[in-house]
Amino acid sequence: MKTTVDSNSCSEIHAMRGPIAAVHTPFDASGRIDPGVVPAYAEHLRSAGIAAVYVCGSTGESLALTTAERRSILEAWTETAAGSIRIIAHVGSNALPEAEELARHAHEVGVDAISAMNPTFGRARNVDDLVRHHARIAAAGEDRPYLVYEISAFGGVSFPAAEVIERAVSMIPGFAGLKFTSSDPLQLQLAVALAETHGLRIFFGADENLLSGLAAGCVSAIGSTYGYAAEPA
């Protein structure tokens, strides 16, 4: 199959190696988001050797935040960390227009990549429907590399990762790979092998199974526990 994967997107993604912190969204004592915490948070991660963050994903409680809150948190990260920490913005939403709006905003504030989880409501009937959903979000993000966030444990639709990759390389010009959060080793191995043939990247997302991800060939991982990293000795 002829692919339409953008080589620039892949090169930017391949520059992200090692642990990527899926960052928490800070809240104050009254339960409001607190973007003012982000500079200290970013400095802690920099001092611990973390070179990239995944903002407003499941760890960041994105689906419990308003669109305005998600925009505000992402802006705090880009204003604080752009140029010193690479930023992947999660823009997924069950409301496709909201996801598209967040993708446009992510592009405007200069993130390094965009990602979205599969919808958990109004599920796609087949792989093509699912990839068309992601293609619309990716198009709103214009030239930003795009990662599909596979996390079937959240109850969303799930198809074999290799099938998603095969469709995405021909339907999403900026497609750069997957954030794979599953405990299925066979699916992971197939996805890694296929990603390599297309010059893509699989980011392993199940922290507790990191060793199996490394054994399967992943060279980078996105997870909440990497944000707890101690300062290197």
Residue ranges: model-predicted function:
Residues 2-157:
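Active-site beta->alpha loop and helix N-cap motifs at the rims of alpha/beta catalytic domains
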